């Protein structure tokens, strides 16, 4: 069997490229959502956006972070008006991140924040880092 070099090269390229294309399709989507308003309606919108993204793409196909800083940190407190929604978000593997700069400046202790919330040194910087890493950015 005599296969011309061009056909052999084309088959080789196809064999190597096909698995790579499959891996690209399976790559997880990543989105970081900013909430910097002390407004239950904005928080509800952000949480709804996160759940809708999971519903559309599949929970296993997307990483979601909601970063709260400035006045938005108030909604991450244990007694906030959206505390029940925070619990549902955490249960759905949505990462809730509180800005420690805001906490320090407003004298909020980690014990004041809803259980399951994680902490980042600086919310704005964390969002910038995620954008550099290729994460999609939303601000409802």
How does the language model describe each region?
Residues 1-15:
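N-terminal secretory signal peptides and thylakoid transit peptides that target proteins
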Residues 21-140:
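Secreted/extracellular ectodomain signature
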């Amino acid at each position: 069997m005599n296969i011309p070099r061009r056909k052999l090269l084309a088959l080789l390229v196809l064999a190597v490229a096909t698995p790579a294309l499959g891996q690209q399709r399976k790559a997880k989507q990543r989105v970081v959502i900013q909430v910097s308003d002390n407004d239950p309606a904005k928080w509800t919108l952000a949480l709804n956006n996160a759940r809708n993204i999971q519903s559309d793409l599949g929970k296993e196909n997307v990483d979601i972070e909601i970063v709260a800083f400035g006045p938005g940190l108030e909604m991450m407190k244990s007694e906030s008006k959206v505390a029940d929604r925070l619990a549902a978000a955490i249960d759905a593997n949505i990462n809730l991140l509180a800005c420690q700069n805001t906490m320090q400046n407003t004298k909020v202790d980690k014990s004041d924040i809803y259980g399951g919330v994680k902490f980042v040194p600086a919310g704005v910087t964390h969002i910038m880092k995620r954008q550099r890493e290729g994460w999609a950015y939303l601000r409802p």
